[in-house]
Amino acid sequence: MIAPDEPFLRSIPKRWIPREMTTAPALDSSEPKAAAVEPHYVEPHYAVLINPFYSKDANASFGKHVLTPTLALISFAATTPAHWRVEYWDENLLQGRPPFRPMPQVVGITVHLTFARRAFELADWYRVRGSKVILGGLHVLSCPEECAPHADALALGDGVQLWPRILRDIETNSLQPRYGATYENDYCDDPPPRRSLLRRRSFLTTTSLIATRGCHNRCGFCYLATDGLRMPYRMRHPQQVVEEFKADRQPYAVFIDNNLGSRRDYLHSLCAALRPLNKIWSAAVTIDVTDDPSLIRNMALAGCTGVFIGFESLSDDNLADSHKKTPKTSDYARRVRILHDYGIQVNGSFVLGFDHDRKDVFARTAEWIEENRLECATFHILTPYPATPLFRQMEAQGRILHRDWNLYDTGHAVFQPQHMTPQELEQGYAWIYHRLFSHASIWRRRPEDWQAIPLYLAMSYLYKRSNRFWHLLIKHGLVNPVWKPLVKMTRWRHVRYRRRLAQRETTIGAPGQVVSAGV
């Protein structure tokens, strides 16, 4: 038992964090100030797409930022006309400031809440030097008036539809201040992302895939509940996904769908298509996917080695307040066992600071995670994103503490909790990460299959206890070379495991019938 007051008995030592992980690269480090506004040569038909820098949380693993690339900007790049040269730049790969010699004619910048300030800094820097700047992303949708002064045009909605239109208008000097598109188009018509633009060695895998768009839930705290964001559930043909997986020639893929399991009939079909590849993958699903244990078996046979599940809370009252459709929390443990019985690891996501959370929530959550041997856990302080139901509720109650968007990163308390102080919420958040990333907790959650323990420990220590080294792996392009041997070993074990699984009876949910793949 963990004492309810343990998180508050002593202060958690602050983890060391390299300056490169908290501070964006200087934009004018090599130029005298007098030259900052001098005219620059602007190359026609040259576009740069930028994912801005954001400060990393010292409590969490830095590795989560480079597991797989985001797809939005390289998906837009795939729609760029052939006579345009396009470049992709992710500031979080620690390669310095974005390209500026020659100055691109067009700069597209994605804007999210926690790096809006950096996005505006980049936008202003490029505009004064002659580039046309297009801002898009969720923050543009939720706070367009805040973004407009920093852009030549705003892209509100599906950028895959908007990007070619914007470039055409730039060519004809008819650029409009705003462009809008819905997410209701047939998703299967989108071209595959342009992965050739990626710095491949800086990611665990470059094969981030999207098979579906949207989610059957609309939780009040989720960014999908943002005003104006209507994202009907859309699915790509399974064979399209298979061809994209094969084309990138990687052994491991991460599905970055909001919820791959919203349509179980579709997921059954997708698993049937993926199974012949003999590759491995992970995905985000909701825990109710275990309503159909035969689907869990098919996922394992298709190569699923891990799932990211938003448990959010162990309180039914909190989940009801959030309008999340989910099974009773008392049934979570049984459902986790079903996943484990089929060799599927669980990364549980938990939100801390709901209105029914008291100061014992940290100890109770940590204890439950250890009892149920979740291989990994991710934590977030409840954060009211602008233009969501949660933000409106807290604003009406006078509980919003400030609007420093940089701190709306789910690692800081930006509102007044009901049953603790903001400082206690932040201390509990730091404690639970400290607890779950400790040697003792990692060992408590080891697989029951002793043969899987060495690989589990190697991955756990690299991911959870190597923050001192992650910035070096990222900066020097060593993420993929270091991870790939572990991924290959995981794939080898899982291929052997699912051969045994395929030969077994299809009886579902009997603990011990299936040996954990340990991946």
For each predicted feature, which ranges?
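Acidic, low-complexity intrinsically disordered segments
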Residues: 25-248, 252
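Short, hinge-like loop/turn segments at secondary-structure boundaries
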Residues: 66, 104-105, 150-154, 172-174, ...
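Alpha-helical structural signal in soluble globular domains
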Residues: 79, 83, 125, 129, ...
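Radical SAM [4Fe-4S] cluster-binding motif and immediate context
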Residues: 191-347, 352-354, 358-367
